[in-house]
UniProtKB/Swiss-Prot annotation:
Keyword Hydrolase included in the entry's annotation: yes
Substrates-to-products reaction catalysed: a triacylglycerol + H2O = a diacylglycerol + a fatty acid + H(+)
Protein name: Lipase A
Pfam families, A to Z: LIP
Organism from which the protein derives: Moesziomyces aphidis (Pseudozyma aphidis)
Length: 462
């Protein structure tokens, strides 16, 4: 599909207008309920961070959000201790929702929303707050309320970490994965949940990247967590492959955001790139890291940008330290400089074969490699979808899989067998899985503009 600059601009404008119109089911104030994270001490790592254990809650506060109100859920922000890429103790923030009627025994649902930007005020915890002026609000008002609302209907405790951390290190796998695992620990600590509480994870696109890294690091970083399943779709499994796929194309802003995010997580990469930036590159890197420069701006500002035009060295990907970092920031074994782990719990992975934002082939390679090492993966490639339609196609089947994982009833499959999961055909329908109210909300997304500057749909879920 050919995408023009004019079409991207018009779609982003429509997406912004859709957010400002606000969901019909909620009454939202224009201003966020709390200060911008840049002005909020809650987003500052305390000087004694090293005295806290991983996942220990440092401070907490009750917050109003636009999500979970129909379920009478209580929402809180937790500041907790986690670990960065350099294995240093740092603080992070997670939003948690406490169900009005918790399932017994307790179950924990970890949801990773796509943030896809490198500014602190793009963080999910800020976007979730009641209000309309948050710069990344569009990521929190479309399918996200449906997913979290469904989990609360089941009585699951919900945690959604700011997986990019206070540095907003987009696409930095270690940083994201550890932040998520410690966010789950923080929720368990905050609610005094049993040590063996079942945990499941879900994410799409940038949120899927965070999810796959959490699943990959779980066995070594948080082996005590009782993870029973994970679903993720449109997953960027390789930083290098995703960058190469995006650079120079209509969604080149994500390639630039990835360079910015990885550099924020790897100081040696930051120093290396800074020394090679030309004048345009210096200005552009400062811009993408600027306050309020979030997913819509990333997409709108840089279509067809060649990131190499910002530096005086076009061989960066093959030079140290970047070449070595890219071999670390991948879960594809054929590219990795380390042994990629194989999670033991069942997973549901879906992807559009003609995906125009996240390349399909690396994800398929990851599934093949994992299956060869004994993984349990339900693989659902969609041959006639693209990034946004696949997001909707996989939503109901992925949540159904999560419920099965919690119930211990995931289907036995030959790992990696490509079988498209279709709600109402191969899985229960949207009404059966979500209930009629949430199913109708999902159908209402058909044709609405997404945060990616493209519409959901056009196919309405059954």
């Amino acid at each position: 599909m050919r995408v023009s600059l004019r079409s991207i601009t018009s779609l982003l404008a429509a997406a912004t207008a859709a957010v400002l119109a606000a969901p019909a089911t909620e009454t939202l104030d224009r201003r966020a309920a709390l200060p911008n994270p840049y002005d909020d001490p809650f987003y500052t790592t305390p000087s004694n961070i090293g005295t806290f254990a991983k996942g220990q809650v440092i401070q907490s506060r009750k917050v109003p959000t636009d999500i979970g109100n129909a379920n009478n859920a209580a929402s809180f922000q937790l500041q907790y201790r986690t670990t960065n890429t350099q294995n240093e103790a740092v603080a992070d923030v997670a939003t948690v929702w406490i169900p009005a009627k918790p399932a017994s025994p307790p179950k924990i649902f970890s949801y990773q929303v796509y943030e896809d930007a490198t500014a602190l005020d793009c963080a999910p915890s800020y976007s979730y707050l009641t209000g309309l002026d948050q710069p990344n609000k569009v990521t929190a008002v479309l399918d996200t309320p449906i997913i979290i609302g469904w989990a609360l209907q089941q009585g699951y405790y919900v945690v959604s970490s700011d997986h990019e951390g206070f540095k907003a290190a987009f696409i930095a796998g270690y940083e994201e994965g550890m932040a998520i695992l410690d966010g789950i620990r923080a929720l368990k600590n905050y609610q005094n949940l049993p040590s063996d509480s079942k945990v499941a994870l879900e994410g799409y696109s940038g949120g899927a990247h965070a999810t796959v890294w959490a699943t990959s690091l779980a066995d070594s970083y948080a082996p005590e967590l009782n993870i029973v399943g994970a679903s993720h779709g449109g997953t960027p499994v390789s930083a290098k492959d995703t960058f190469t796929f995006l650079n120079g194309g209509p969604f080149a802003g994500f390639a630039l955001a990835g360079v910015s995010g990885l550099s924020l997580a790897h100081p040696d990469m930051e120093s290396f790139i800074e020394a090679r930036l030309n004048a345009k590159g210096q200005q552009t890197l400062k811009q993408i890291r600027g306050r309020g420069f979030c997913l819509p701006q990333v997409v709108l500002t840089y279509p067809f940008l060649n990131v190499f035009s910002l530096v005086n060295d076009t061989n960066l990907l093959n030079e140290a330290p970047i070449a070595g970092i890219l071999k670390q920031e991948t879960v594809v074994q054929a590219e990795a400089s380390y042994t990629v782990s194989v999670p033991k719990f069942p997973r549901f992975i879906w992807h559009a074969i003609p995906d125009e934002i996240v390349p399909y082939q690396p994800a398929a390679t990851y599934v093949k490699e994992q299956c060869a090492k004994g993984a349990n993966i339900n693989f659902s490639p969609y041959p006639i979808a693209e990034h946004l339609t696949a997001e909707i196609f996989g939503l109901v089947p992925s949540l159904w899989f999560i419920k099965q994982a919690f119930d211990g009833t995931t289907p036995k499959v030959i790992c990696g067998t490509p079988i498209p999961a279709i709600a109402g055909i191969t899985t229960p329908s949207a009404d059966q899985v979500l209930g009629s109210d949430l199913a109708n909300q999902l159908r209402s997304l058909n044709g609405k503009q997404s945060a990616f500057g493209k519409p959901f749909g056009p196919i309405t879920p059954p």
